[in-house]
């Protein structure tokens, strides 16, 4: 508050839209046990599931923060930076990595954004005067700085 106006940009992913972890839908698992969020992770760690959950948590954080600081000059929003040409694929499990490597090698140049392009939405949320002028808080943005509906679970 002392340095207001302030911005909080929570970087998420389109994986935040995956319903696994919220509803016990058979193809997506058994859902999150909110009394012990680590219960299923201890028995069977699934990186994709945990990544999606963490990205949904980023959206929930920005939304909750925006509500808590409503009326103050603090602007909290979240965004998906887009498919960016980074080294994220190095963390993909071995059984999927061959397919992923093949995809990225063949389509990287035209399907993925450069890191500079991928940073544009975050830079917009962190620096654009429009955020304050239009009182934009608790919103979800997609590349390139397009406001869209957040995941329905957020």
Language-model segments: residues:
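Rossmann-fold NAD(P)H-dependent dehydrogenase/reductase core
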Residues: 1-97
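Short, intrinsically disordered, charge-balanced linker/junction segments flanking boundaries
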Residues: 20, 149-154
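Short, Lys/Arg-enriched charge-dense amphipathic segments
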Residues: 89, 96-104, 154
């Amino acid at each position: 508050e002392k340095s207001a106006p302030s911005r909080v940009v929570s970087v998420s992913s389109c994986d935040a839209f995956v319903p696994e972890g919220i509803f016990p839908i058979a193809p997506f698992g058994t859902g999150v046990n909110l009394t012990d969020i680590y219960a299923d992770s201890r028995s069977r760690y699934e990186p994709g599931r945990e990544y999606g959950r963490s990205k949904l948590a980023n959206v929930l954080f920005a939304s909750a923060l925006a509500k808590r600081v409503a009326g103050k000059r603090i602007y909290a929003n979240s965004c998906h930076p887009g498919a960016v040409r980074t080294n994220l694929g190095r963390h993909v499990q071995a059984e999927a990595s061959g397919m992923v490597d093949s995809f990225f090698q063949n389509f990287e140049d035209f399907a993925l954004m450069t890191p500079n392009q991928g940073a544009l939405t975050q830079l917009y949320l962190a620096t654009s005067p429009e955020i304050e002028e239009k009182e934009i808080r608790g919103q979800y943005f997609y590349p390139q700085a397009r406001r869209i509906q957040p995941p329905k679970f957020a």
